[in-house]
């Protein structure tokens, strides 16, 4: 099974409440493709829902090191930091997410002209 299929299966498992299965599939995906941003993004969300906040933060930051301009990752990091009680970190991540959102909006506006 390729990384994309494994991530899709993991997301389905997660949506069905099978968190451990989703975590395993996503870990397997990252073994196969350690730089898969999609797998890291999904894994950070699964870990957060499992109350594995430190692990979720670690994976999310790893994904951001690969894709620093990924809006959804920055929003995820803010959510993780809120859960962790890191108000300053959450505010910083939220500010970065806001800027990334504006950049995306500007890029979309430029494409529509």
Predicted regions and their residues:
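Alpha-helical segment of the N-proximal tetratricopeptide repeat
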Residues: 2-32
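Structural signature of tandem alpha-helical TPR/SEL1-like repeats
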Residues: 15-25, 50-62, 85-96
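Terminal, low-structured helical/coil segments at or just beyond the last alpha-helical repeat
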Residues: 3, 82-113
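Amphipathic alpha-helical segments of tetratricopeptide repeats
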Residues: 31, 65, 98-99
């Amino acid at each position: 099974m390729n990384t994309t299929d494994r991530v899709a299966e993991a997301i389905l498992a997660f949506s069905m409440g099978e968190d451990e299965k989703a975590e395993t599939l996503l870990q397997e995906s990252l073994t196969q493709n350690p730089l898969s941003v999609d797998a890291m993004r999904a894994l950070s969300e699964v870990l957060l829902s499992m109350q594995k906040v430190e692990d979720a933060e670690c994976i999310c930051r790893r994904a951001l090191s690969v894709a620093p301009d990924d809006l959804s990752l920055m929003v995820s990091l803010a959510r993780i930091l809120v859960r962790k009680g890191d108000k300053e970190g959450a505010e910083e991540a939220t500010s970065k997410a806001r800027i990334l959102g504006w950049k995306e909006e500007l890029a979309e506006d430029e494409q529509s002209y």
